[in-house]
């Protein structure tokens, strides 16, 4: 991982570099084609590792973002039904205290629960120019879903 001020370091080195108050995690969209129970189990193991290495940090599990309606309708794997199912499963990893689940989709979705066309140019990924909006939303408390 390349980290500003640290250069290229391992994930272990990042976790050892300081005590974090908050850790935001979004994983799993690329694993939708694999058995979900296995992916969720690995996700849980990753969260357990974070808890062990950063016991005082609040971990925020972010929902995976939806894809556009067109992509969802045409893709047997990367569609919003599968994304929602996966998000429901990872939400169960949260305990509501030190591990919290936050759904970022309302920030980028259209009125029908799909990634709005204006936020993407590939039907899947939010454009980089919206990352600051995303970060600001999380920092502001994500409408009460993430405590300051």
Regions found by a protein language model. Give the residues of each.
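Conserved SGNH/GDSL esterase-like catalytic core that processes O-acyl groups on lipids
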Residues: 1-45
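Low-complexity, flexible helical/coil segments
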Residues: 5-11, 57-64, 136-142
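A generic secondary-structure signal
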Residues: 13-14, 45-50, 137, 141
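N-terminal cationic-hydrophobic initiation segments that often serve targeting/anchoring roles
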Residues: 15, 50-52, 91-94
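Loop/turn elements at helix/coil->beta-strand transitions in domains of secreted/extracellular proteins
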Residues: 18-23, 54-59, 96-100
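Active-site segments of SGNH/GDSL-like serine hydrolases
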Residues: 26-30, 48-84
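Generic structural signal for well-ordered alpha-helices
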Residues: 43-48, 87, 91
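Catalytic His-Asp segment of secreted/periplasmic serine-dependent ester chemistry enzymes
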Residues: 66-148
């Amino acid at each position: 991982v390349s980290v500003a001020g640290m250069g290229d370091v391992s994930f272990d080195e990042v976790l050892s570099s300081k005590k974090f108050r908050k850790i935001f995690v979004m994983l799993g969209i690329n694993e939708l084609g694999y058995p979900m129970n296995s992916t969720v189990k690995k996700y849980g193991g990753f969260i357990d590792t974070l808890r062990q290495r950063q016991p005082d940090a609040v971990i925020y599990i972010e929902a995976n973002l939806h894809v556009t309606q067109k992509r969802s309708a045409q893709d047997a794997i990367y569609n919003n039904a599968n994304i929602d199912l996966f998000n429901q499963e990872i939400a169960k990893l949260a305990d509501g205290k030190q591990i919290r689940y936050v759904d970022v989709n309302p920030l980028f979705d259209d009125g029908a629960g799909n990634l709005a066309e204006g936020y993407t140019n590939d039907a899947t990924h939010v454009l980089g120019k919206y990352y600051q909006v995303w970060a600001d939303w999380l920092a502001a408390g994500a409408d009460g879903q993430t405590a300051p």
